Amino acid sequence: MHIDQKVIDEINSKPFTLASRKGVVGLDGFVDKIVAPVEKRHGLGDQFDAVSTIAEMGAKISAAAGKSANIELFPRFEKLGGNGPIMANAMLALGMEIRYIGALGSPMINPVFEEFASKTKAVSLCEPGITTALEFKDGKLMLGNTLSLENIDFATILEKCGEGEFIDLIAHAD
């Protein structure tokens, strides 16, 4: 694709900043738990062979039909997840002032959201959802638990945020 140099020059001549802009973002929040399914153990901790592919995992699950199976999931790390927090972080990176209202933990903010909640002066509505992401060489299989998000409604937003503060946040957002 060819882009005319005049267009490139005009775009480059325009300052791009969102530093003077304010936004309100919500409403979800997920703790992403990244795990490796264990194929064979060789010792404690991370001494194991992981299930390599989604097809191999599918075969293990299919082989358990009519029986039972226990597949160990080795925890690799946890991180912030959810469409709202990811979008809010992107807007923060562009210099916007962001307030976040969403599922970050209750009564305490979940540790994966502490820095984010501080940067956004977040109002947490409920516990976050949980995504357990099984990582393979050929992709991820994400298993989501969204039950806690069923607690999010307008009445809860007003209760946790305060009606006056919520109206003020919305009124002053760009």
What residue ranges belong to the model's regions?
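Active-site-proximal loop->helix
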Residues: 107-123
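Charged interaction/catalytic cores of defense and host-pathogen modules
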Residues: 105-107, 166
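Glycine-rich phosphate/diphosphate-binding loops that line cofactor/substrate pockets in enzymes
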Residues: 14-19, 166-174
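Glycine-centered loop/turn motif at secondary-structure junctions
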Residues: 95, 116-117, 138
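Glycine-rich phosphate/adenosyl-contacting loop at the front of the ribokinase-like
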Residues: 1-99, 108-111, 131-133, 143, ...
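Short acidic (Asp/Glu) patches
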Residues: 82, 115-119, 128
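Conserved phosphate-binding/catalytic loop of the ribokinase/pfkB sugar-kinase fold
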Residues: 123-172
